[in-house]
Amino acid sequence: ANSLIEKNRQQIPKKVVSAKEDKGEPIDVFEAYSDVEEGEIVVNKIIELRRKNDCEYNDFAILYRTNAQSRIFEEALRKRGIPYKIYGGLSFYQRKEIKDVISYFRLVVNPDDEEAFKRTINYPTRGIGKTTIDKIIDVSANNGVSLWTVLCNPFIYGLDVNKGTYAKMQGFRELIESFIADDINKNAYEIGLDIIRRSGIMNEVCQDNSSEGLSRKENIEELVNGMNDFCA
């Protein structure tokens, strides 16, 4: 494997040296019953070793196979108040696809959330362009009302859009209102599934067959898994 990795021009050079059997710490192997338990065991081990050996948190590293797996460790670390830094990527909740899904949740909980509104109104693309969004922002500022209020009452506030754009705006409004209505009878996991499917987020991600697209898909699936754990 190392002979192939060496062909990578961007690879960081390293020398792999085998150790003698009588040197180094033995490897502990454990089997966890769930990813949540795995995260807790790893973090508890860090706390134990830090206490025994008078170490600092920056003396420890957690290696995982895929980016999506970082969530469970990040949550376990946060629960115990342990600071951490992600190397070679972003923290799970800072990844674009995760922030996109969470923005839909934020808008469902609070339709007047302007940051969430701007992030979701045309993502995935639904034909509501920057010009229209800028008009909504201007009308909102001039009338002292939220962006959502303008979207729901475009003619009352004199928003100048054509019939096609109006129909697309109303389609978005109806989508969000349906999620809001579902909030009464469905839990976060069920609403999360609805959001990624009906908004078109998962469909867009699945159309990207690159390694990055696969990673984004795995991240979204891991987010939904976390919601399921929360609701269980």
Give residue ranges: language-model regions.
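Short, surface-exposed, polar/charged, turn-prone segments marking secondary-structure boundaries
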Residues: Q10-V16, G89-S91, D112-E115, E222-V224
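Conserved RecA-like helicase motor-core motifs
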Residues: G81-S91
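Conserved helicase C-terminal RecA-like lobe
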Residues: E56, S70-I82, R95, I102-A232
